[in-house]
Swiss-Prot record:
Family statement: Belongs to the paxM FAD-dependent monooxygenase family.
Name by which UniProt lists this protein: Notoamide E oxidase notB'
Residue positions the entry lists as glycosylated: 75
EC main group: oxidoreductase
Application in biotechnology: Notoamides have been shown to exhibit antitumoral activities. Notoamides A-C show moderate cytotoxicity against HeLa and L1210 cells with IC(50) values in the range of 22-52 mg/ml, but the IC(50) value of notoamide D is greater than 100 mg/ml. Moreover, notoamide C induces G2/M-cell cycle arrest at a concentration of 6.3 mg/ml.
Bilayer-spanning residue ranges: 11-31
Organism, as annotated: Aspergillus versicolor
Key words of the record: Alkaloid metabolism, FAD, Flavoprotein, Glycoprotein, Membrane, Monooxygenase, Oxidoreductase, Transmembrane, Transmembrane helix
EC number: 1.14.13.-
Pfam families documented for this protein: FAD_binding_3
GO biological process: alkaloid metabolic process; biosynthetic process
């Protein structure tokens, strides 16, 4: 792309020679940022220390607030990202108590512009990487970034004994970000919240000869399932993907790992979960599938919360952290990937609207538009986790039940693209004049859970 394009919601999109964006970390945040910046006409250099785009995980949900961004790609077609092998074709999200009584069935339709899709995480990352490569974006794997630098006019990194120069650096290097401390001057110690998470996804053939587990697959030819069970101090989600080709399950249980590990996720047998389920009336039903998890297919991690950073942008204004590097989430709100994608879209828009001579302004406006929204969702995710693990199904207070935090409308229905175009000038004025900026993408009362907020 060498000529200017136009955007009906903004000014002319500049040629790639006008701006070079270096992106460190090619997970969901980094790959989406690479694609969004490429769509604006910028030159993108993507760097990833791993040899490929594979990432551990089971199922990730991309709700309407992020899917509407991806839907703008490829002339409005999602065919390049979505196929039967990487999605869960569910018709309802079903919630149960520990006795197996269904408490809620939320109709689910992937074509609903608010609800979005459930993906196999590895499949989604592979699709994003493939699409970025098809666009001709310069993605470099197996590259270790050693340091970051900026001047008044440029920013860049030192990687594999090479100095790489651009107009700005976007660090999307995840929860264990090396860039965070360098760019923001902050590197807060994550707090262990006393919960251990387990997750797995494996070929459904592993349970094909287990009669007690066939309930998981009985409707697989027509639809996948997604069941969540909430008991005191333990929650379990189990279901299928790709029309029954895969079984996935995840569990969060209050407690602590006996050993501390440097890696954030460790292979582990499912035995601790099977032990927890022994006291559940519905436990044997769930254990029938979980017990057949193949060796090496279950992973455990201690859940740790990271407090909101005071700032995301470097002192010189040419480097920024996004995604988990800026605001990691506990898994309960299901918004980690979604907010990373929102970050990426807003980044591209702010660079476009600020212009190439105002890169520091662009990055600081990104922070203004995004910081309070993601900070509130971080807080709400912790509140949701307490509700899920308390499992107060019989409480007279609706706010205490596990159903209280499902699908908050202000989160899922948000259009960050329209919002960024509408609010850019107000946020830019706040940055330039040192004014307070009042965000319009969070509830006025500043609370995550809204009384009538569920979709």
């Amino acid at each position: 792309m060498t000529k200017s394009q136009t955007n009906p919601r903004g000014p002319a999109i500049l040629s790639p020679a006008d701006l070079t964006v270096i992106i460190v970390g090619l997970g969901i945040a980094g790959l989406t940022a690479a694609i969004e910046c490429h769509r604006k006409g910028y030159t993108v250099i993507g760097l990833e220390k791993k040899p490929d785009a594979n990432q551990l995980g089971d199922i990730i949900g991309l709700s309407g607030n992020s899917m509407r961004i991806l839907a703008e790609w490829n002339n409005g077609s999602l065919a390049h990202l979505i196929d039967d092998d990487i999605t869960c074709d569910v018709t309802a999200l079903e919630l149960f108590d520990a006795e197996g009584h269904r408490k809620l069935a939320m109709p689910y339709n992937a074509n609903n512009p608010i609800q979005g899709y459930l993906f196999r995480r590895t499949g989604l990352l592979t699709s994003l990487c493939h699409y970025a490569s098809q666009l001709g974006i310069d993605l470099r794997f197996g590259v270790t970034v050693d340091d970051y630098w900026e001047t008044d006019s440029n920013a860049g990194v030192y990687a594999n004994n090479e100095k790489i120069t651009g107009d700005c650096v976007v660090a999307a290097d995840g929860f264990h970000s090396k860039a965070r401390g360098i760019i923001t001057g902050e590197n807060p110690e994550p707090k262990d919240i006393g919960v251990v998470a387990y997750r797995s996804i494996f070929d459904a053939n592993a349970i094909a000869d287990v009669p007690e587990a066939q309930w998981i697959l009985k409707n697989a030819q027509t639809a996948d399932i997604f069941h969540s069970y909430y008991g005191k101090d333990t929650m379990v989600a189990i279901g299928t993907a790709a029309r029954g080709r895969y079984v996935h399950w995840g569990c969060a249980v209050r407690g602590a790992l006996e050993e501390k590990y440097e890696a954030w996720m460790q292979p582990a047998p499912p035995d601790p979960i099977l032990k927890c389920l022994e006291s559940w009336p519905v436990g044997s039903k769930l254990a029938a599938g979980i017990a057949r998890t193949p060796p090496g297919k279950c992973f455990q991690q201690s859940l740790r919360a990271m407090p909101p950073l005071k700032r995301w942008v470097s002192t010189g204004g040419r480097m920024i952290v996004i995604g988990d590097a800026a605001h990691s989430f506990l898994p309960y709100a299901g918004q980690g990937g979604n907010q990373a994608i929102e970050d990426a879209a807003v980044l591209g828009i702010c660079l476009e609207l600020a212009g190439t001579s105002n890169v520091p302004l662009a990055l600081r406006v990104v922070e203004k538009l995004r910081h309070k929204r993601v900070s509130l969702i971080q807080k709400g995710s912790a509140e949701a986790g307490d509700s899920f693990l308390n499992a107060a199904w019989e409480s007279d207070n609706a706010a205490e039940k596990p159903t209280a935090f499902t699908h908050q409308a202000w989160v899922y229905a948000h259009n960050c693209v329209d919002h960024a175009y509408e609010q850019f000038n107000a946020a830019a004025e706040a940055v330039m004049n040192g004014w307070e900026y009042t965000p319009t993408n969070i509830p006025a009362n500043g609370k995550f859970r809204q009384e009538e907020g569920n979709i």
